């Protein structure tokens, strides 16, 4: 019932001195992706994926819309 209408990915990588040894070089990397689907109902579903990675830290997060937002009949699926 759905197809991808829009897709985009941004990446950034920065070098900096390492926290555990400032004489060494470490990096941080950031990636952000966005996609939009057009569905038959018709309505759009947009999810954003955010990830952050460094030597001692990693974060991956998925953000999606509230299906109940501005809906006559709330979605409980």
UniProtKB/Swiss-Prot annotation:
Residues 1-77 are annotated as: V (Cys-rich). The keyword Transferase does not apply. Transmembrane segments: none annotated. Pfam families: Neurexophilin (PF06312). It is found in: Secreted. Its main location: secreted. GO terms for cellular component: extracellular region. It comes from the Eukaryota. Keywords: Secreted. May be proteolytically processed at the boundary between the N-terminal non-conserved and the central conserved domain in neuron-like cells. InterPro entries: Nxph (IPR010450), NXPH/NXPE (IPR026845). PANTHER family: NEUREXOPHILIN (PTHR17103), NEUREXOPHILIN-4 (PTHR17103:SF10). Belongs to the neurexophilin family. May be signaling molecules that resemble neuropeptides and that act by binding to alpha-neurexins and possibly other receptors. This is Neurexophilin-4. It comes from Macaca mulatta.
């Amino acid at each position: 019932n759905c197809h991808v209408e829009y897709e985009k990915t941004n990446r950034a990588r920065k070098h900096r001195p390492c926290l555990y040894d400032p004489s060494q070089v470490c990096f941080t990397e950031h990636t952000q992706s966005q996609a939009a689907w057009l569905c038959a109902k018709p309505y759009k579903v947009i999810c954003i994926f955010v990830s952050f990675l460094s030597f001692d830290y990693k974060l991956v997060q998925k953000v999606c819309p509230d299906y109940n937002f501005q809906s006559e009949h709330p979605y409980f699926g």
